[in-house]
């Protein structure tokens, strides 16, 4: 989600912008990913647009785009990480898209997903459309960020944060049900 899109949300809902990271003073660049949002703030934005945060399974399906590979291309071509980011986020869509035409699925910012984190969940979950744990202490983020080593920019990597956490490495994208 971009700063520009989030500003529209804030303007129409009387909300407030998140804390400004030092590399985007005043949220001047609308094409940067929105960061410093909590899980609840991300969820509220998605609901406002008629969507929701994707489940972890949906996110992984989207990033893989029909592939079983760990990445959808060479790491320098697909994502921003600690070795090429210059210590900050970058405008969305600057790196190569995946097979579904989605940009920034790996790198730039971690993305909140709907699921609670359970380190062992996938060992016991159904293989088709797992619903995710019903409770937990942290919410899942996926995709890696501009501060991580390149080996973390892989389709299966997952991490967790408390839902109230926010930071210059955490953003989100929304999902919608598409009726054919």
Predicted regions located by residue number:
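Active-site rim elements
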Residues: 30-33, 92, 97, 158-164
């Amino acid at each position: 989600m971009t700063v520009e899109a989030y500003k529209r949300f804030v303007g129409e809902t009387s909300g407030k912008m998140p804390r400004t990271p030092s590399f985007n003073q005043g949220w001047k660049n609308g094409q940067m990913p929105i960061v410093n949002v909590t899980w609840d703030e991300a969820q509220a934005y998605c609901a406002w647009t008629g969507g929701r945060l994707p489940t972890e399974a949906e996110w992984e399906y989207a990033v893989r785009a029909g592939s079983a590979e760990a990445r959808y291309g060479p790491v320098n071509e697909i994502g921003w990480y600690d070795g090429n980011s210059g210590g900050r986020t970058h405008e969305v869509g600057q790196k190569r898209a995946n097979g579904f035409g989605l940009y920034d699925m790996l790198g730039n910012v971690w993305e909140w997903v709907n699921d609670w984190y359970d380190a062992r969940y996938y060992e016991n979950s159904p293989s088709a459309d797992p619903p995710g744990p019903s409770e937990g202490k942290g919410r899942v983020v996926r995709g890696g960020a501009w501060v991580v080593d390149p080996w973390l920019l892989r389709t299966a990597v997952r991490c967790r944060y408390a839902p109230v956490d926010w930071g210059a490495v955490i953003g989100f994208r929304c999902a919608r049900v598409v009726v054919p």
